[in-house]
């Protein structure tokens, strides 16, 4: 037979080497019959092998459609592997039962009842055996007949030789509406029906007019002809959301996720552990300065660092270098070691280490951590001592923001910076360190904000922390509950804990010092920041805020435990615990609060309705508090304790202003007491100015106040009126006095202002460069320096002439004659001010204070001021002059005044050194016992 006549036939799998495998495949897939049921297939297999090459298939059938060709629709289906039946077989081979469908791989009709369906092995979502066909093909659905469900072709499609296609849908099989959602919608539907019915009744009542009105029906009243069938949100969008969730994520940008940021912080932390190593001093100096830090800084200014942990890490070399540099910088001012000693003043010795630490902290302002925060606090104190007002103010603000960012104002049990959601429980030492750092920020805010234009940032109610425990509990890791700032107990002790039940006994010097400074902050807000003017009641009324603050001061001192009340025995106990300076500082602050409030009451002396008893009591409290401060300083000196906190120096300064007025009293006992106490205070202030630069200004202010009071007494002025002036020197005024610190190592006068940058006011309104006629005559003409070399050459000549005059033997009136450049106005006032700067109250002649106040001012206007707050020995060139004040001021000998004359340099320092009226700082607030 010629095979070329079989063009319209397509035989599947002609090139198969073994038909038995094909038969076995059909059996396993559909009928599970033995290969012996198809003998004709084996015969045809042999012909197929002989007629066509191995692996070749006719190409004519590929171009035909599935419907137009008699070939099976799918070559991959089991039905395409079987040959045609005998009606279309031109080979004449006999076949048995070829029309029953067994050659197509389906079960015979007689076996339909016994065989199981192909989809019977499937399971439902609930896990039960499936009994119904899950999905019919398109052809069976169209003809509304039962589909057998075989894939890829069902029985009906195979018999009809039509393509069998199953519709693929992404919608999950399930009910169209959720049953619970339907129940939820029922009340809403009933409510809508009731509203519609009520609206219809209202319309019928309103339409009483007989004329026809054509109007449209109310939306919703007419039933819609088309039923609305809506799917639930889960049914409609569930598959899409599931598909969107399974989409692989896009490549992440570097640094976009939280883990990368944590890795960056980890790298910064590792870098922080190494940065600054090259600037560290030797190990011996580090340990020496660390001991000085814990003796003079920690516990007095701020309560920072745990000494056992710090010293252990310092010896092991595991501390961050920036922290070591900061501690060395602030402690270097207290050392006398030749390894640290330098030609610079004591308060500038650690500036080199501070500059390195400051640069490291500035580069890490966006990564808050406890190490950087502690360094900012200590550096702010160091800049405070070097007269860097603006820098100290900025560092304090940065530290406060960082403390709140670290959640230090909350008493947390777990570390909030735990990575990957892990919670690390904090130990007692770590929790106490966090509390003390936050309280240090609170104290720094009170110290730096003591001025009218610098309000406080931290409110008392924002700190939800207990006060620090006793120092020995902190050092030896002994947990103990304490009170909060307002007196509440956040964690009451239980008998099972084994802790001390009395929370007040657990509170040491640090806790009550914080309460004293907090009360001082409230007093500042009332007196200096406008709250006094808002008080509806006068000061002497019981309902006034002034009386409330006064009662708070008295109650705070009365609430001290017995171990914290001042006595010689308690001072010795604190010396054994190495906390005597803290103990003395706390009592200095308590007495200063009394002095500050009582002195402020003198400003209302001339108000209408003032009681005399009110001022007499205020005067008594003021003088007693000033005397008590001097007694504490004297006892500290006798016991070998040095209170090095800067605020203690301001307490001494406030006490000194009261003693200056006490010296002028007509009461002999008050006068003698004031003389002795003034001597103690002046010695202490001179000792403090070695370590804190701003006390140079305070010492000179005290000297100016003293001599101005003498001048006023000689001029016949009423000292009582001067004593009641409302303005006085404040602790925060040094910010304006030294906004940028010392300008160079030669100690230029810090009062000289830095030249303003031309672009500093670029965003403000343009100022005209021309001046009016009035400004031309009233304002000074700017000086033009044409020959700078001549001026520079003249300066050494003036210095040489000054040295020659200094080296000459002093004779009566010689200094006065050499320095007097008397103007006509000064001559006219000579008889009025017959007294000079000598300390004799009467009988002093031959000296003109106005002349002394104007001597050599032109010389010092272009050169360095003779008195600078950085100059440690301003009177070193006078061998006969005391290094503190003139001998007369310390000896308080009013009978001897060195012929009423003082050294020329001293007169220049007092009257020409500062351009300010020091009379406003005269210890106001004291009335005299005449």
UniProtKB/Swiss-Prot annotation:
Domain of life (superkingdom): Eukaryota
One BP term from GO: DNA-templated transcription
CDD domains: fungal_TF_MHR, GAL4
An annotated Gene Ontology molecular function: zinc ion binding
Annotated DNA-binding residue span(s): 137-164
Record's GO cellular component terms: nucleus
Keyword Transcription: yes
InterPro entries (alphabetical): TF_fung, Transcription_factor_dom_fun, Zn2-C6_fun-type_DNA-bd_sf, Zn2Cys6_DnaBD
Keywords: DNA-binding, Metal-binding, Nucleus, Transcription, Transcription regulation, Virulence, Zinc
Induction pattern: Exclusively expressed during infection of common bean.
Subcellular location: Nucleus
Predominant localisation class: nucleus
Pfam families named among the record's database cross-references: Fungal_trans, Zn_clus
Record carries keyword Transmembrane helix: no
Additional information: Multiple copies of the gene are present in highly virulent fusarium oxysporum strains.
Role: Zn(2)-C6 fungal-type transcription factor that has a role in the establishment of the fungus within the plant and/or the progress of the disease. Regulates the expression of virulence factors such as SIX1 and SIX6.
Protein name (Swiss-Prot/TrEMBL): Zn(2)-C6 fungal-type transcription factor FTF1c
Organism of this sequence: Fusarium oxysporum f. sp. lycopersici (strain 4287 / CBS 123668 / FGSC 9935 / NRRL 34936) (Fusarium vascular wilt of tomato)
């Amino acid at each position: 037979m010629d095979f070329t006549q079989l063009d319209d036939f397509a035989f599947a799998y002609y090139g198969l080497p073994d038909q038995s495998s094909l038969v076995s495949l059909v059996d396993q897939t559909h009928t599970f019959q033995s290969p012996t049921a198809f003998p004709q297939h084996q015969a045809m297999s042999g012909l197929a092998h002989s007629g066509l090459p191995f692996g070749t298939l006719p190409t004519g059938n590929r171009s035909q459609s599935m419907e137009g060709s008699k070939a099976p629709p799918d070559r991959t289906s089991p039905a395409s592997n079987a040959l045609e039946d005998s009606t279309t077989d031109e080979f004449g081979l006999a076949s048995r039962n070829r029309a029953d469908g067994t050659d197509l791989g389906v079960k015979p009709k007689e076996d339909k009842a016994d065989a199981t369906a192909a989809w019977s092995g499937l399971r439902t979502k609930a896990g039960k055996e499936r009994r119904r066909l899950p999905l019919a093909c398109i052809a069976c659905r169209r003809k509304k007949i039962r589909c057998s469900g075989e894939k890829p072709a069902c029985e009906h499609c195979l018999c009809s030789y039509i393509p069998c296609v199953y519709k693929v849908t992404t919608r999950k099989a399930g009910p169209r509406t959720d049953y619970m959602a339907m129940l939820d919608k029922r009340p809403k539907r009933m409510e809508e029906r009731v509203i519609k019915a009520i609206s219809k009744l209202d319309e019928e009542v309103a339409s009483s007019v007989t004329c026809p009105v054509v109007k449209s029906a109310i939306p919703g009243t007419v039933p819609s002809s088309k039923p609305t069938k809506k799917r639930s949100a889960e049914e409609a969008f569930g598959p899409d959301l599931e598909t969107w969730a399974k989409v692989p994520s896009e490549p992440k940008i570097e640094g976009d996720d939280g883990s990368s940021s944590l890795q960056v912080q980890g790298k910064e932390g590792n870098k922080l552990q190494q940065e600054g190593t090259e600037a560290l001093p030797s190990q011996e100096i580090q340990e020496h300065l660390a001991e000085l830090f814990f003796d003079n800084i920690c516990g007095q200014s701020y309560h920072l660092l745990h000494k056992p942990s710090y010293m252990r890490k310092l010896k092991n070399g595991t501390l961050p270098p920036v922290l070591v540099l900061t501690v060395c910088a602030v402690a270097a001012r207290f050392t006398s070691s030749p390894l640290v000693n330098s030609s610079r003043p004591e308060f500038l010795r650690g500036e080199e280490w501070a500059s390195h630490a400051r640069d490291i902290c500035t580069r890490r302002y966006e990564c808050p951590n406890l190490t950087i925060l502690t360094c900012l606090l200590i550096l702010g104190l160091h800049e405070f001592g070097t007269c860097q007002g603006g820098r100290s103010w900025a560092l304090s603000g940065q530290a406060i923001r960082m403390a709140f960012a670290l959640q230090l104002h909350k008493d947390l049990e777990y570390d909030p910076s735990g990575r990957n959601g892990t919670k690390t429980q904090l130990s007692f030492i770590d929790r106490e360190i966090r509390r003390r750092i936050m309280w240090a920020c609170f104290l720094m805010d009170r110290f730096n904000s003591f001025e009218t234009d610098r309000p406080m940032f931290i409110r008392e109610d924002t700190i939800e922390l207990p006060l620090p425990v006793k120092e020995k509990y902190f050092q030896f890791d002994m947990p103990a509950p304490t009170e909060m700032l307002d007196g509440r107990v956040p964690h009451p002790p239980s008998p099972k804990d084994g802790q001390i039940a009395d929370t007040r006994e657990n509170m040491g010097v640090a806790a009550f010092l914080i309460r004293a400074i907090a009360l001082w902050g409230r007093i500042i807000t009332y007196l200096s920041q406008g709250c006094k003017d808002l008080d509806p009641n006068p000061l002497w009324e019981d309902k006034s805020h002034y009386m409330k603050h006064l009662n708070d001061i008295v109650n705070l001192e009365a609430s001290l435990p017995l171990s914290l009340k001042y006595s010689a025995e308690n001072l010795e106990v604190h010396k054994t615990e190495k906390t005597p300076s803290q103990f003395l500082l706390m009592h200095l602050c308590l007495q200063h609060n009394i002095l500050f409030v009582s002195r402020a009451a003198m400003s209302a002396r001339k108000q209408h309705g003032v009681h005399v008893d009110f001022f007499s009591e205020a005067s008594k409290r003021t003088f007693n508090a000033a005397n008590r401060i001097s007694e504490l300083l004297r006892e500290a000196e006798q016991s070998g304790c040095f209170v090095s906190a800067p605020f203690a120096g301001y307490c001494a300064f406030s006490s000194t202003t009261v003693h200056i007025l006490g010296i002028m009293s007509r009461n002999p006992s008050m006068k003698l007491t004031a003389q002795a106490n003034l001597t103690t205070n002046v010695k202490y202030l001179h000792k403090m100015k070695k370590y804190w630069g701003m006390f140079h200004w305070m010492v000179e202010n005290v000297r100016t106040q003293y001599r101005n009071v003498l001048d006023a007494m000689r001029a016949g002025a009423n000292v009582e009126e001067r004593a009641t002036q409302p303005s006085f020197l404040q602790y925060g005024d040094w910010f304006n006095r030294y906004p940028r610190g010392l300008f160079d190592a030669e100690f230029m006068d810090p009062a000289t202002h830095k030249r303003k940058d031309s672009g500093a006011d670029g965003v403000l309104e343009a100022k005209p460069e021309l001046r009016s006629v009035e400004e031309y005559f009233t304002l000074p003409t700017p000086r033009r320096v044409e020959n700078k070399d001549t001026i520079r050459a003249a300066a050494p000549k003036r210095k040489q002439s000054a040295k020659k005059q200094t080296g000459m033997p002093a004779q009566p009136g010689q200094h006065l004659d050499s320095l007097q450049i008397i103007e006509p106005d000064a001559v006219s006032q000579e008889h009025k001010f017959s007294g000079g700067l000598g300390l004799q109250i009467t009988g002093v002649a031959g000296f003109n204070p106005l002349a002394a106040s104007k001597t050599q001012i032109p010389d010092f206007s272009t050169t360095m001021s003779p008195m600078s707050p950085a100059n440690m020995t301003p009177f070193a060139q006078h061998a006969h002059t005391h290094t503190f004040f003139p001998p007369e001021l310390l000896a308080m000998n009013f009978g001897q005044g060195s012929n009423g004359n003082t050294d020329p340099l001293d007169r220049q320092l007092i009257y020409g050194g500062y351009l300010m009226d020091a009379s406003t700082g005269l210890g106001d607030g004291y009335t005299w016992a005449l």
